[in-house]
Amino acid sequence: MKKLIAYWFVFIVLSFSVSAQFIDRANKVSPSIDYAKLAYIDTLINNYLRNEWETGIVTIIVKDNQLVQYKGYGYLNAATRKPMPPDAMFRIMSQTKAITGVGIMILYEQGKLLLDEPVGDFIPEFRNQVVLDKFNAADTTYTTVPAKRTITIRDLLTHSSGIDYADIGSAAMKAIYAKAGIPSGLGYFDRDLKTEMKKLGKLPLGFQPGEKFQYGLNTDLLGCLIEIISAQTLDAFLRENIFEPLGMKDTYFNVPEPKANRLATVYTENDEHHIIPWSHSFRNIDPDYPTMKKHYFSGGAGLTSTAFDYAIFMQMLLNGGIYNGKRILSPRTVEIMTSNQLDFHFNGTDDFGLGFEIVSDKAANLGPKNKGSFSWGGYYGTTYWADPKAKMVCLIMTQHTPNSHGDLASKITDIIYSSLRK
């Protein structure tokens, strides 16, 4: 009888543990939150909207698996004055990277790749690479030296491979990439992903592998590796292995037409710092790219999603790779992803894991986030983080860049942490 009671006790505890792994959307008051202090977020955001420093924002806060805040502010479209709904869809740009990184780690757990395996094992064009030595800006000619070693999958995940971006990197690499027709990875391209990545493999690296951090097309290349190894498109692989198991119903490379009316309008600023709608002439990015049928699936910047969908993804990682009973990764793999992988602070203060910025000891003393918090964001003004110590996931979503009042997310972050009772 005692054994039977013990078994039932274990069963109940395990059942509760599994059920507690999803985000509880019930309207409950969290004892961990000082709601009077949290309300300063409303005051702050409304001030930014009133001064026309922002047009529309969505915030979401999940604490102890409980939905604490999920709000839309301002407008989905400022011209039509359509209110911003909490389930608005955002071009999340570089927030795509973490999802692609998890895709790679799924293949890693299946034994289909090693983190320190050469990229050239899968794409021959990345064998025998060279590194840029001297560059002549007058005619874009250059000299090279041999790479000391081949680039690896770990190098791609940590942006330490020497691969650059085609439109935001160094002047030399931008010129070399432009001459070769390498895409930026942002927006829409009527091209083949594998073809473009093979072209990239024939070009020089910007520095010796592992020596520096340089944001670049690394995650587009990881997406290409997923397609080669899995024999699926990146879209199909992520949908089958991440989106559908987690119930991420609003995350797409190609947004379905019936959901297009939930897309937030993208804004930029004119020379007087007044907000204006984004035009496709800016950086050659058509703002309608989420609805444009594409087959170049950018693992670095191609997804559109909602704050709640992305919160589910982050909660899965915070739970150690499981959400609502669906295991995506093992706890140890998540631990590896969210542990420092570089011998240097990539931005002077923070560590960098396999796809995430990680708050270091040094950074934890400079701001509210606890050591070990992992985060990143997207070009159009979206940002996210998960704080394991606080058991919290937060997202702040806008569609506005460049932004002369880009300190809003930092101020919201300060308010969130000041509202924590424990």
Where are these regions (language model features)?
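Bacterial Sec-dependent N-terminal signal peptides
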Residues: M1-D24
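Short, conserved catalytic-motif segment at the N-terminal edge
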Residues: V29-I92, K112-L114, V131-N136, D288, ...
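Short, surface-exposed loop or secondary-structure junction motifs
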Residues: R127-K371
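Extracellular/periplasmic catalytic domains that process cell-envelope and extracellular macromolecules
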Residues: W53, P83-M84, L114, T144-I151, ...
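Short, contiguous pre-domain boundary segments
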Residues: Q21-S30, A180-S184
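Active-site SXXK
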Residues: D42-I45, N65, F90-I123, R127, ...
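Short loop/turn microsegments at loop-to-beta-strand junctions
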Residues: T55-I57, V68, Y380-T383, M392
